[in-house]
Amino acid sequence: MSKGTEGHFDTLPIGRLGLIPLNSSAALGKKVDDYLVSWRKGRGNEFAEKYVAAYEGYERDSYIIQSQVPRFGSGEAKGIINESVRGDDIYILLDVCNYSLTYSLCGYTNHMSPDDHFQDLKRVIAAIGGKARRINVIMPFLYEIRQHKRSGRESLDCALGLQELTAMGVENIITFDAHDPRVQNAIPLHGFETIQPAYQFIKNILRNAPDMKLDKDHLMVISPDEGGMGRAIYMANNLGVDMGMFYKRRDYSTIIDGRNPIVAHEFLGADVKGKDMIIIDDMISSGESMLEVAKLLKDREARNIYMCSTFGLFTSGLEKFDKAYEEGLFTKVLTTNVVYQTPELLSREYYISCDLSKYIALIIDKLNHDASISGLLDPADRIQKVIKKFKNHEKI
């Protein structure tokens, strides 16, 4: 990791940078912190006339602000900040899907749910007590994003969650691949950014598929449903290939586990025979839909199948994926490290983890200087550079 190589800014920071990774994102937070420390080493002295070298706390050995959320025996909790954050530009990082964390509830071991993580976030914000200059929340998997619209007498949990955060003083909310970005309409006067990791997916696929041919005759991008067409079109356009999609026929007369069951997947697109497939979606929950799509593509004689998803939840375990891999239904599964990854998942030979820590660090570095992040929201230039390297047989 080279020192002082990322970012040259013409503005002073909004405030002293402070990073608060909650326990759910401790490992990711450490990686983000390492990047920030490396980039800022020497930057203040090198550009003293712009940065003011003596700017308090600009260059530090760590930007992590120590915090904790201890619990009482009843399961109740409180947020604690262990150092001053007065005047700081705070970035709180959390993973609401990290079920590996536990706490004692009246003598019983209780795994933390998304609700628990969201409450802990609010506790930490409350502990800051309005003393920070600005509070930004980086929540890669947006809390309750799948409950973004109302069908009948239902609660709008995602909108309520966003409004709670802004009411507590949060100015910016950064998330990845929001299931429906229109939920930002709940907080139209506050910062809300949703980022797609298409660049990381393309880079990691090309690293692991040296024989892939990037043309319409040998590659297609597939959306497993109509809701994900936007991300599939974006990736297909950047790769210069065609896209196809499946739409789900559902039984609207039945409700199972809160949803109408899928009756069949119908395909719309060109012939897939002999072509490599990139299936891209926002999340793998149980994985049944993704595996069904892979099977249907294999039935149509597709070649290699790469399944990409920002969030690999694998709520029903890995057995179905293990079996499908043994049967040759797919080549690789790619998800990111912004949600909890089990040791079992990381050990699978078919699994590729896409690290987003540098991406998050870049966002924080720019926002702290109130600089534009447009180039990070649309990484088309970076994607084209990777594709050029791949075609020239250079190391990616």
Each model region followed by its residue ranges:
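PRPP-associated nucleotide enzymes
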Residues: 1-396
